Amino acid sequence: MKKLNFIIKCGLALLLLSFYSCESWLNVTPSDRLSEEMLFNDREGFVKALNGVYIELNTNELYGRNLTAGALDVMGQYYSVASSSHAFYNYGGLVYTGNDEKALFDNMWQKCYAVIACCNTIIEKCDERQDVLPGVYYGLYKGEALALRAMLHLDMLRLFGPVYDETSKTAECIPYVTNTDAQISPLLSAEVVLESVIGDLKTALNLLKESDPVLTDGVRNEGNSIGDNALNYRQFRLNYYAVKA
């Protein structure tokens, strides 16, 4: 009862405050939005955001383990897991109904779409802040973000979509998220998802063709003398050739 009274009092206080200073309250900038605007206020912010995406790709939920030499490879029968006490034993037997298995797939899904959301923010901000992305940087950053978005959606389709054929391709399976809205995106058919993947890759390829230094200077496998390595070590990025492959 005390908790209920507290909630009611807080609600009344907020209501009175809104009547007292509605205009000021509406003009308050949320902290996450403020941080976002500050991050993308210069080119270095875009570098940090894109680096953050690559760092998240390396977590255990994604390519640091589960989507490479972890559960996925065991499911693909690359490894033989004979001991029933092994954490990946059920994956080798194609049994995914246990709580641990469900949790792994759930974490994989959530992490993947969280990273996709970061890619979408970068793509959106590239268009909004072209003024701080001179020369090749606009095409380079937007191209990489588009390619990363396509790659992640393709892996989600491989995991959670149907075996692709003329019959199954129309079945709804996963969303293809291209915006930063906090709304639930609808499930799309495997056919539409693949069309979206190809569309993103084509756009990324066109952007990187005009901006990626890997085409003219190679991977630039050394540090820049002035300490700015944004255009160096291209072998560690989703570069033009990686997208084209």
What residues fall within each predicted segment?
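Bacterial Sec-dependent N-terminal signal peptides
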Residues: 1-31
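Membrane-proximal, proline-rich intrinsically disordered regions
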Residues: 22-71
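Extended ligand-binding clefts on enzyme/binding-domain cores
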Residues: 44, 50, 59, 188-192, ...
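Conserved, well-structured interaction surfaces
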Residues: 86-160, 187-192, 206-208
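Residue signature of alpha-solenoid helical repeat architecture, marking inter-repeat boundaries
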Residues: 140, 147, 171, 228-231, ...
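Aromatic- and glycine-enriched pocket-lining scaffold segments that form the walls
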Residues: 208, 219-244
